[in-house]
């Protein structure tokens, strides 16, 4: 059985890399939204549990040869288990399922949707978009704009921002943002490659992050706040880029290769810069919850230290689900709401870093 959760609910750049010497203003990479609410979030949790011990058992030989200890994934990343789809399940079907339940929770019909954005990193082919398959499966009208936003692990928050802007402009009334991920093939390929001869510790650690990935799906409905007084206001947010680090994490279905040390360093420098720049537009120092992209203990602790927020206000789900890419933030948000840890009136921060490097931050008022 599938398990469901539904809730209503720069680094400093050299001068020659700067794109604009003028101060950042709302409406560019900093935005405020006037009349947009998050109406629902729904998630689909994959059936099959794969523990870190299961993966390491399949890598026992190479771990022994490289003199790396068993228990490394849980000790270093904090990931105890992750989910994979069972036989006959696909990430696209899961995304459709989450989308249907998100619409039902929001109280809207497929014909009401004016925009569908898919943010999946996983894709079975280069074209057409994953969005067209989801558009068809969800029974959306021909008038519903549909496309993919691919921006590594930030795609879902980016899509919420794009959708919010289109709602504020009056172009659409309701938007459905969806994401489905399947980590199975990339992990199988990674395990096979690491078990081949000639791999050293550097090779192993460059593919370590692939072993922490998980499968899952999520969807959210956004709509006009004035028509939904019970919705959760999307206040606004910021995005910033440090694309000089574009090659620190490069992935495909064959594998994901990461310079983890430099990615963390560059990512946290960008987070600090974006956080400091956001202070003139937002007061995020004392939010009720900080829902971050889910990667590892190391990443979460670094983010908390970088922006100086209380660790007990930062929920984590990577221990159970691993890194589910763009679905991680909505999965964690839904988990917090379902557990009663986000309540009416709470101020909620969404944020993360995506390979490339980009960061996105957003404020919700529950």
Regions found by a protein language model. Name each.
Residues 4, 8-88, 196-265, 269, ...:
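Condensing-enzyme catalytic core mediating Claisen C-C bond formation in acyl metabolism
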Residues 96-99, 122-124, 135-136, 141-143, ...:
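Claisen-condensing/thiolase-fold acyl-transfer catalytic domains that form or cleave C-C bonds
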Residues 112-119, 285-293:
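Short glycine-rich phosphate-binding loop at a beta-alpha junction
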Residues 55, 60-61, 129-141, 164-169, ...:
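A glycine- and small-aliphatic-rich helix-loop capping segment at beta-alpha/alpha-beta transitions
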Residues 171-190, 242-246:
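Acyl-CoA/ACP chain-elongation machinery
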Residues 39-42, 119, 150, 175-181, ...:
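Short beta-strand segments
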Residues 80, 112-115, 138-149, 198-205, ...:
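Glycine/charged-rich beta-loop-alpha catalytic/anionic-binding loops adjacent to active sites
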Residues 67-69, 91-106, 266-281, 329-336:
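Short, well-ordered amphipathic alpha-helical segments that serve as non-catalytic structural scaffolds
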């Amino acid at each position: 059985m599938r398990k469901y959760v539904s809730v209503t609910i720069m680094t400093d750049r050299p001068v020659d890399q700067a794109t604009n010497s003028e101060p950042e203003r709302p409406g560019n990479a900093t935005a405020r939204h006037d009349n947009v609410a998050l109406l629902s979030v729904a998630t689909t949790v994959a059936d099959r549990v794969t523990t870190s011990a299961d993966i390491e058992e399949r890598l026992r030989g190479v771990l022994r040869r490289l003199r790396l200890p068993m228990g490394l994934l849980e000790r270093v990343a904090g990931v105890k288990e992750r989910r994979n789809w069972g036989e006959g399940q696909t990430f696209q079907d899961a995304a459709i399922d989450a989308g249907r339940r998100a619409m039902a929770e929001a109280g809207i019909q497929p014909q009401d949707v004016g925009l569908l954005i898919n943010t999946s990193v996983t894709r079975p082919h280069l074209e057409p978009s994953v969005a067209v398959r989801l558009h068809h499966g969800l029974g959306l009208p021909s008038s519903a704009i549909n496309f993919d936003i691919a921006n590594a692990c930030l795609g879902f928050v980016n899509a919420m921002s794009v959708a919010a802007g289109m709602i504020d402009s009056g172009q659409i009334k309701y938007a459905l943002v969806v994401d489905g991920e399947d980590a199975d093939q990339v992990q199988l390929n990674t395990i096979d490659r690491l078990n081949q001869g000639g791999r050293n510790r550097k090779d192993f650690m460059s593919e370590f992050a692939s072993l922490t990935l998980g499968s899952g799906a999520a969807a959210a409905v956004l709509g006009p706040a004035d028509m939904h007084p019970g919705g959760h206001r999307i206040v606004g947010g910021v995005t910033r880029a440090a694309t000089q680090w574009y090659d620190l994490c490069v992935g495909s279905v064959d594998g994901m290769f990461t310079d983890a040390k430099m990615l963390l360093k560059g990512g946290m420098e960008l987070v600090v810069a974006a956080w400091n720049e956001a202070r003139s537009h937002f007061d995020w120092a004392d939010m009720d919850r900080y829902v971050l992209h889910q990667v590892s203990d190391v990443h979460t602790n670094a983010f908390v230290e970088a922006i100086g927020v209380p660790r007990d206000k930062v929920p984590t789900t990577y221990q159970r689900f691993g890194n589910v890419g763009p679905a991680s933030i909505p999965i964690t948000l839904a988990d917090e709401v379902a557990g009663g840890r986000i309540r009416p009136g709470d101020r909620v921060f969404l944020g993360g870093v995506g390979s490339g490097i980009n960061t996105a931050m957003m404020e919700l008022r529950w």
